[in-house]
Amino acid sequence: MIDRYGRPLEDLRVTLTHVCNFSCFFCHMEGEDTESMQGLSPHQIGLVSRVAVEFGVKSVKLTGGEPTLRRDLPEIIREIRTSGVRDISMTTNGFLLANIAGKLKDAGLDRINISLHALTREKFKDVTGVDGMDRVIAGIREAKNQGFKPIKLNFVLTKRNSEEAKRVIEFSEEIGIDELHLIELHPVGLGRSTFSFHQGMEELEKEIAKIAVKSEIREKHFRPRYTLPSGLVVEIVKPYANPIFCAGCNRVRLTVDGKLKTCLYRDDKVIDVMYALSNKDLTLEERLELIRHGFEAAISIREPNFKYMMKIEAQQA
């Protein structure tokens, strides 16, 4: 289904929990209110996924908090898989991944994004609050052993870890990572208080572009992508105040408390479907129909957060 700005709905991001075993200083917690910590049940997530497929959703990404803290994570993945979703991925800090990667693969998880914000032990602990670099690296290696494809690493660039970027690039090349996402720090949710650590990407991107054997713009989100001689693809993620990024947005978020959040940056553009998910007096079809109404409403209010910048640029052209 397409919104009034011509953007199709293709992705659903599901926040499984707000609990995390890391305390990264820049975490935006998916732009959600953190008062509600426990997420929806596997069955509830499955219901929303089932309706989402009817509206054109092809892929689901599991986020947090830290998704691997959910003991029922394999069950959640199976519920989503049976709903008809084509592609299931997850973003994780990787700390627990080495022990459960096989179970997640067997349950139907296709792809993994693993956060790696430093490759020196002291800096890793400074960024995440946890002395867990070795366990994260073990998780990355086990994900490769299990055959997840592609495996992507996420690196959030800040003033506190900018010197780590090249180390992470080299590590990604050495072990055969498919893609590395260099992500701009942006002021969303809890991340607003740490935006003073924002580090521009211009110089780093120029250095990467110089050695790249191929450069392109990702069609889905209009992000620059550079293929290095090693085969590693480096993608630049700069969503903040970026109307081009907003123009390519094709996702809706399902929050831990049962709301459809239409924009990471907006707290007012949400539709509550918790009644449909939690009312035991409703039949299955009644629940599904209410969730359908929720998606229809969400799509009707969905709009690019930075559309005002589109208007300014159009006037200046």
From Swiss-Prot:
It is an enzyme of class 4 (lyase). Residues 4-223 form the Radical SAM core domain. Pathway: Cofactor biosynthesis; molybdopterin biosynthesis. [4Fe-4S] cluster 1 binds at residues 20, 24, 27. GO terms for molecular function: 4 iron, 4 sulfur cluster binding; cyclic pyranopterin monophosphate synthase activity; GTP 3',8'-cyclase activity; GTP binding; metal ion binding; S-adenosyl-L-methionine binding. [4Fe-4S] cluster 2 binds at residues 246, 249, 263. It catalyses: GTP + AH2 + S-adenosyl-L-methionine = (8S)-3',8-cyclo-7,8-dihydroguanosine 5'-triphosphate + 5'-deoxyadenosine + L-methionine + A + H(+). Its EC number is 4.1.99.22. The keyword Protease does not apply. Keywords: 4Fe-4S, GTP-binding, Iron, Iron-sulfur, Lyase, Metal-binding, Molybdenum cofactor biosynthesis, Nucleotide-binding, S-adenosyl-L-methionine. PROSITE patterns: MOAA_NIFB_PQQE, RADICAL_SAM. Catalyzes the cyclization of GTP to (8S)-3',8-cyclo-7,8-dihydroguanosine 5'-triphosphate. This is Probable GTP 3',8-cyclase.
